[in-house]
C-alpha cells in the first residue's frame, strides 16, 4: 500500500486483526482459481473468544454477485470443524452472522484456524501459510511506522531539537514505507500465478480513493504475466484506472489553457 496506515475495522470481532478485513473481503472473495475436483479441505478451529461459544460460523464467497454459504459449523466449547470437497482454490471469508472475521484460502488439506482477542491465524496449507505470514510481516512494519509518532514525542520531551527530530524520523519513515511497499510488491510478483497475487493486488488498490495508476502499480504490471492481467478484477481495475488517468490529464490541460488565456 502506498500509505503508512490501515484503518482498523469497527466490528468487535474483526478488529482483532489490524487489517481492515471488511474493506478488502469483496475483492478477496471474488478471486477463484479452478483446479481438481477431487481435493478435500478440512478446517479445525479454536477460539478463546467467549462470545463465539454457541455461535454459528460460516464460510462465504461471492458468486454472480450473491453471497453464498460454502460451509458452516457451530462453536462448541471453543472449537469448530468444517470439511468438504475443495472443487476450487478460492478466497473465502469466515463469518459470524454478518460480521466478517478473517480471510481464508479454501484449498486441499488441513487448515488450522486460531481466533483470539489479539490475533487471527490460519495455517497448515501452503497458501494460508503464505497469506498469514504476509499479513503478519506487513502489520509489523506498519506498527514500526506508527511507533515513529510516539518516538518523536518522547525525543522532544527528552529535550531534543524539534527540527533535528523531524529530519531523523522523516528518513526512518521513508525507509520503513519503502521496505513495506517493496515487500508488498515482491509478494504480489511471487504469487502472480495463484489466488494470492490478484488478492493482495486488489487489497493494495482498495486503499486508493479511486482507481488510478500509481508508480507502484505500473511497476507491478510491467512484469505481470497475461494470466494476471486478464484476471477479471485486475482487468476491471486497470481499465478504470487508465480512464481516470486520461481524465486527470484532460483536466490538467484545461487548467493550463485557462491559465494561459487569463495571462493574455
Residue ranges and their predicted role:
Residues 4-7, 22, 235, 261:
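N-terminal non-cleavable signal-anchor helices
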Residues 37-181:
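A non-transmembrane, solvent-exposed segment enriched in polar/low-complexity residues
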Residues 129-133, 183, 188-195:
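Soluble oligomerization/assembly scaffold segments of membrane-associated complexes
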Residues 1-13:
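Single conserved hydrophobic/aromatic residue that forms the stacking wall/gate
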Residues 189-192, 196-264:
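Charged, long alpha-helical assembly modules
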Residues 10-46:
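Bacterial Sec-dependent N-terminal signal peptides
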Residues 174, 186, 207:
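Short, glycine/charged-rich beta-strand-loop motifs at protein surfaces that mediate ligand recognition
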